[in-house]
């Protein structure tokens, strides 16, 4: 399956698709449609939030259009300082502040325009615990493997996947190579 990150930059075009960290939503920023209305529960899972954004833009026609024709929804980052106090966005999201400031967007005071971005392919090649597959001498770990994360991979799991299954697959492949 494909996993979409719900908040990829939709504007400016120079950073189209750039991932806006999940920490923004985790701190309380909410997605809003062109009418300024919240249309999905805050902190929904990635797949549910992505689907809701796509539906809001494509089916309900409540997206915000950029000068290039791209559509997205607002990510209300200024809400973070209202919830946690002034300076929270600067302190907790310095990389995001710098990234958008390069394009004269102050995410402390201005919302970001976002749209789901293809983020991770949850494999497709079925593996055994040692990383082996039904294809002779093929060992797999990481994004190519299937069945490890399910449909909704959580942040950080892919690193653990590569470490655990990569090590297992490497050992099993080395043993297999001795026999070849």
Language model regions located:
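Membrane-targeting and insertion segments and their boundary/processing signals
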Residues: 67-70, 105, 112, 136, ...
